[in-house]
Design a protein with these regions (language model features):
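Conserved acetyl-CoA-binding loop of GNAT-fold acetyltransferases
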Residues: 131-141
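A conserved beta-turn-beta hairpin within the catalytic core of GNAT-like acetyltransferases
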Residues: 60, 71-82, 92, 139
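Conserved GNAT-fold acetyl-CoA-binding loop/helix
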Residues: 17-42
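Conserved beta-strand-loop-alpha-helix junction that forms the acyl-donor binding cleft
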Residues: 118-127, 145, 149
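Conserved beta-strand in the GNAT
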Residues: 52-54, 60-69, 81, 86
């Protein structure tokens, strides 16, 4: 039976492994265990920044999603950025990812969050279809990045 919960500090090694799998397939990011574990720990220790939700099969983490919080001046309300949605390859296709995503959406609704924004690789058509199936739509906004030293 799959259960959902917020990640704890003891989960960081398993989450880091999932992120390594995710970043190995993304164009813009590279696995860096130290950086990823530092980021995960920062979020877990600071719930005002965000929440990392996990799916567990028995005691093993099989999927994760990261929700980061801010305020939209356009809406005048709290909003979230959804990142790092990843399901272990051996567990894909069984509905775990869809269930975790629905759980994340409900988590946001329960906290009064009014919008969830996410980014996915431009060439990752299957991920885009996955998000569209639960109601996400393409935005006219174009993401841009400036990496600082």
């Amino acid at each position: 039976m799959t259960t959902f919960s917020s990640a704890q500090e003891g989960d960081v090694p398993a989450l880091g492994h999932l992120l390594a799998l995710l970043f190995a397939q993304e164009q813009e990011f590279k696995p860096d265990a130290q950086a990823q574990c530092s980021g995960l720990t920062t979020i877990i220790r600071n719930p005002a920044l965000g929440t990392i939700l996990v799916a567990r099969d028995k005691d093993k983490i099989v999927a994760m999603v990261n929700l980061l919080y801010t305020v939209s001046t356009a809406l005048g309300e709290r909003v979230a950025t959804l990142e790092d949605m990843v399901v272990h390859p051996q567990c894909r296709g069984g509905g775990v990812g869809s269930a975790l995503l629905r759980h994340a959406i409900q988590h946001c609704e329960d906290r009064g969050i009014k919008r969830i924004t996410l980014l996915t690789d431009e060439v990752n058509d299957s991920a885009q279809r996955f998000y569209e199936r639960v109601g996400f739509r393409r935005s006219t906004m174009v993401p841009m990045r400036l990496h600082l030293p």
